[in-house]
Protein backbone atom coordinates (compact mmCIF):
# COMPACT_ATOMS: atom_id res chain seq x y z
CA UNK A 1 0.00 0.00 0.00
CA UNK A 2 1.66 3.31 -1.08
CA UNK A 3 -0.08 5.18 1.74
CA UNK A 4 0.60 2.86 4.67
CA UNK A 5 3.66 1.02 3.38
CA UNK A 6 2.01 -2.30 4.15
CA UNK A 7 2.94 -5.21 1.90
CA UNK A 8 0.94 -8.19 0.75
CA UNK A 9 2.00 -11.39 -0.98
CA UNK A 10 0.09 -11.68 -4.25
CA UNK A 11 1.33 -15.27 -4.73
CA UNK A 12 1.46 -16.63 -1.16
CA UNK A 13 1.82 -20.26 -2.29
CA UNK A 14 4.70 -19.62 -4.70
CA UNK A 15 7.76 -21.82 -4.34
CA UNK A 16 11.32 -21.34 -5.60
CA UNK A 17 11.39 -22.08 -9.31
CA UNK A 18 7.71 -21.19 -9.88
CA UNK A 19 6.60 -18.77 -12.57
CA UNK A 20 5.99 -15.27 -11.20
CA UNK A 21 2.89 -13.56 -12.61
CA UNK A 22 2.33 -9.82 -12.67
CA UNK A 23 -0.65 -8.24 -10.93
CA UNK A 24 -1.73 -6.14 -13.91
CA UNK A 25 -4.84 -4.63 -12.32
CA UNK A 26 -3.10 -4.02 -8.97
CA UNK A 27 -5.84 -5.59 -6.87
CA UNK A 28 -3.43 -7.61 -4.76
CA UNK A 29 -4.29 -11.05 -6.16
CA UNK A 30 -3.57 -13.00 -9.32
CA UNK A 31 -6.90 -13.77 -11.00
CA UNK A 32 -8.71 -13.55 -14.33
CA UNK A 33 -8.58 -9.77 -14.11
CA UNK A 34 -4.86 -9.93 -14.81
CA UNK A 35 -5.29 -11.60 -18.19
CA UNK A 36 -4.36 -9.52 -21.23
CA UNK A 37 -3.39 -9.85 -24.88
CA UNK A 38 0.21 -10.90 -25.47
CA UNK A 39 1.90 -11.31 -28.84
CA UNK A 40 0.56 -10.94 -32.37
CA UNK A 41 0.26 -13.94 -34.73
CA UNK A 42 0.04 -11.75 -37.84
CA UNK A 43 3.34 -10.93 -39.59
CA UNK A 44 4.15 -7.32 -40.34
CA UNK A 45 5.99 -8.44 -43.48
CA UNK A 46 5.72 -11.47 -45.75
CA UNK A 47 8.40 -11.75 -48.40
CA UNK A 48 9.98 -14.08 -50.94
CA UNK A 49 13.16 -14.55 -52.93
CA UNK A 50 13.83 -16.13 -56.31
CA UNK A 51 17.23 -16.32 -58.04
CA UNK A 52 17.86 -18.02 -61.40
CA UNK A 53 21.28 -18.21 -63.06
CA UNK A 54 22.57 -19.88 -66.22
CA UNK A 55 26.04 -20.32 -67.69
CA UNK A 56 27.30 -22.55 -70.52
CA UNK A 57 24.71 -25.26 -70.04
CA UNK A 58 24.56 -25.01 -66.25
CA UNK A 59 21.46 -23.69 -64.52
CA UNK A 60 21.04 -22.80 -60.88
CA UNK A 61 17.91 -21.68 -59.04
CA UNK A 62 17.11 -20.77 -55.43
CA UNK A 63 13.73 -19.89 -53.97
CA UNK A 64 12.87 -18.89 -50.43
CA UNK A 65 10.30 -17.06 -48.35
CA UNK A 66 9.79 -15.74 -44.87
CA UNK A 67 7.87 -13.56 -42.43
CA UNK A 68 8.79 -10.92 -39.87
CA UNK A 69 7.05 -9.14 -37.01
CA UNK A 70 4.90 -11.95 -35.61
CA UNK A 71 4.98 -14.02 -32.44
CA UNK A 72 4.22 -17.70 -31.82
CA UNK A 73 2.52 -19.23 -28.79
CA UNK A 74 4.39 -22.47 -28.11
CA UNK A 75 1.38 -24.10 -26.49
CA UNK A 76 2.38 -27.74 -26.95
CA UNK A 77 5.02 -27.14 -24.29
CA UNK A 78 2.22 -27.21 -21.74
CA UNK A 79 1.60 -30.87 -22.63
CA UNK A 80 5.24 -32.00 -22.77
CA UNK A 81 6.79 -30.33 -19.74
CA UNK A 82 5.08 -32.52 -17.20
CA UNK A 83 6.44 -35.32 -15.09
CA UNK A 84 5.47 -38.30 -17.25
CA UNK A 85 5.77 -36.78 -20.73
CA UNK A 86 8.65 -36.28 -23.13
CA UNK A 87 10.84 -33.20 -22.83
CA UNK A 88 12.91 -31.30 -25.33
CA UNK A 89 16.56 -30.54 -24.58
CA UNK A 90 15.40 -27.05 -23.61
CA UNK A 91 14.46 -28.48 -20.24
CA UNK A 92 18.15 -28.83 -19.40
CA UNK A 93 18.06 -25.07 -18.79
CA UNK A 94 15.31 -25.28 -16.15
CA UNK A 95 15.56 -23.89 -12.62
CA UNK A 96 16.82 -26.65 -10.32
CA UNK A 97 18.35 -24.81 -7.42
CA UNK A 98 19.77 -21.51 -6.26
CA UNK A 99 21.99 -19.89 -8.87
CA UNK A 100 20.54 -21.84 -11.81
CA UNK A 101 18.32 -20.65 -14.67
CA UNK A 102 15.74 -17.95 -14.03
CA UNK A 103 14.30 -18.30 -17.55
CA UNK A 104 12.62 -21.71 -17.30
CA UNK A 105 10.66 -22.78 -14.21
CA UNK A 106 11.29 -25.82 -12.08
CA UNK A 107 9.61 -29.05 -13.15
CA UNK A 108 7.59 -30.42 -10.29
CA UNK A 109 4.52 -32.60 -10.71
CA UNK A 110 2.99 -31.12 -7.57
CA UNK A 111 3.50 -27.47 -8.62
CA UNK A 112 2.37 -26.75 -12.15
CA UNK A 113 1.71 -23.02 -12.17
CA UNK A 114 3.86 -22.86 -15.34
CA UNK A 115 0.92 -24.52 -17.13
CA UNK A 116 -1.00 -21.25 -17.35
CA UNK A 117 -0.49 -19.45 -20.64
CA UNK A 118 1.86 -16.50 -20.20
CA UNK A 119 4.61 -14.69 -22.07
CA UNK A 120 6.79 -17.64 -21.06
CA UNK A 121 5.21 -19.37 -24.06
CA UNK A 122 5.48 -16.46 -26.50
CA UNK A 123 8.44 -16.43 -28.89
CA UNK A 124 9.66 -14.50 -31.90
CA UNK A 125 8.13 -16.07 -35.02
CA UNK A 126 10.40 -14.49 -37.65
CA UNK A 127 11.93 -16.92 -40.12
CA UNK A 128 13.39 -17.25 -43.60
CA UNK A 129 13.18 -20.63 -45.33
CA UNK A 130 15.24 -21.76 -48.32
CA UNK A 131 12.47 -23.76 -49.91
CA UNK A 132 14.24 -25.06 -53.02
CA UNK A 133 17.73 -25.22 -54.52
CA UNK A 134 18.21 -26.77 -57.97
CA UNK A 135 21.38 -27.33 -60.00
CA UNK A 136 21.26 -28.75 -63.52
CA UNK A 137 23.36 -29.25 -66.64
CA UNK A 138 22.29 -29.71 -70.26
CA UNK A 139 24.61 -32.30 -71.83
CA UNK A 140 23.64 -31.31 -75.36
CA UNK A 141 26.23 -28.60 -74.87
CA UNK A 142 28.87 -31.34 -75.03
CA UNK A 143 27.50 -33.24 -78.00
CA UNK A 144 25.08 -32.40 -80.76
CA UNK A 145 22.30 -34.68 -81.89
CA UNK A 146 19.57 -34.09 -84.41
CA UNK A 147 17.34 -36.40 -82.38
CA UNK A 148 17.80 -34.88 -78.92
CA UNK A 149 17.29 -31.18 -78.27
CA UNK A 150 17.82 -31.38 -74.50
CA UNK A 151 19.40 -33.87 -72.13
CA UNK A 152 19.41 -32.18 -68.77
CA UNK A 153 20.37 -33.82 -65.50
CA UNK A 154 19.51 -32.02 -62.30
CA UNK A 155 19.59 -32.33 -58.53
CA UNK A 156 17.20 -30.51 -56.23
CA UNK A 157 16.74 -30.05 -52.49
CA UNK A 158 13.45 -28.92 -50.99
CA UNK A 159 13.17 -27.41 -47.51
CA UNK A 160 16.94 -27.02 -47.32
CA UNK A 161 17.27 -24.74 -44.28
CA UNK A 162 15.29 -22.38 -42.07
CA UNK A 163 16.82 -19.35 -40.37
CA UNK A 164 14.92 -18.58 -37.16
CA UNK A 165 15.30 -17.93 -33.45
CA UNK A 166 12.15 -19.91 -32.67
CA UNK A 167 12.94 -22.84 -30.36
CA UNK A 168 10.03 -25.01 -31.50
CA UNK A 169 10.05 -27.62 -34.23
CA UNK A 170 8.92 -25.38 -37.09
CA UNK A 171 8.07 -21.64 -37.14
CA UNK A 172 5.80 -22.11 -40.17
CA UNK A 173 2.90 -23.42 -38.15
CA UNK A 174 0.00 -22.35 -40.37
CA UNK A 175 -3.55 -23.03 -39.24
CA UNK A 176 -4.32 -26.24 -37.39
CA UNK A 177 -7.24 -28.07 -38.97
CA UNK A 178 -8.45 -24.92 -40.68
CA UNK A 179 -9.51 -23.31 -37.40
CA UNK A 180 -8.91 -19.57 -37.27
CA UNK A 181 -8.32 -19.62 -33.53
CA UNK A 182 -5.11 -21.62 -34.01
CA UNK A 183 -3.42 -18.81 -35.95
CA UNK A 184 -0.02 -18.30 -34.34
CA UNK A 185 -0.46 -21.22 -31.94
CA UNK A 186 2.04 -24.07 -32.23
CA UNK A 187 0.20 -27.27 -31.36
CA UNK A 188 3.27 -29.41 -31.95
CA UNK A 189 2.82 -30.34 -35.59
CA UNK A 190 5.69 -32.34 -37.07
CA UNK A 191 7.86 -30.16 -39.33
CA UNK A 192 8.13 -30.67 -43.08
CA UNK A 193 10.78 -33.10 -44.26
CA UNK A 194 13.84 -32.21 -46.31
CA UNK A 195 13.60 -33.85 -49.73
CA UNK A 196 16.41 -34.68 -52.16
CA UNK A 197 15.53 -35.28 -55.80
CA UNK A 198 17.43 -36.21 -58.95
CA UNK A 199 15.93 -36.10 -62.41
CA UNK A 200 16.34 -36.01 -66.17
CA UNK A 201 14.75 -33.67 -68.71
CA UNK A 202 14.81 -35.29 -72.14
CA UNK A 203 13.46 -33.54 -75.22
CA UNK A 204 13.49 -34.85 -78.78
Language-model-derived ranges and their functions:
Residues 57-61, 143:
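Repeated loop/turn-to-beta-strand initiation elements of outer-membrane beta-barrel proteins
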Residues 2-9, 13-18, 67-158:
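Extracytoplasmic gating/loop element in the C-terminal half of outer-membrane beta-barrel translocons
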Residues 43-47, 126-131, 149, 192-196:
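Residues that define the transmembrane beta-barrel architecture of outer-membrane proteins
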Amino acid sequence: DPETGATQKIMPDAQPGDVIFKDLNNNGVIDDGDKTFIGDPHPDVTYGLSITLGYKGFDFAVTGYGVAGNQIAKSYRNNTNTTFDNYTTEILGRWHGEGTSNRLPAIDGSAINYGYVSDLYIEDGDYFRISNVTLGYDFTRLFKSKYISQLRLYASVQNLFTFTNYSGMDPEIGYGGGDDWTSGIDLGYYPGARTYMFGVNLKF
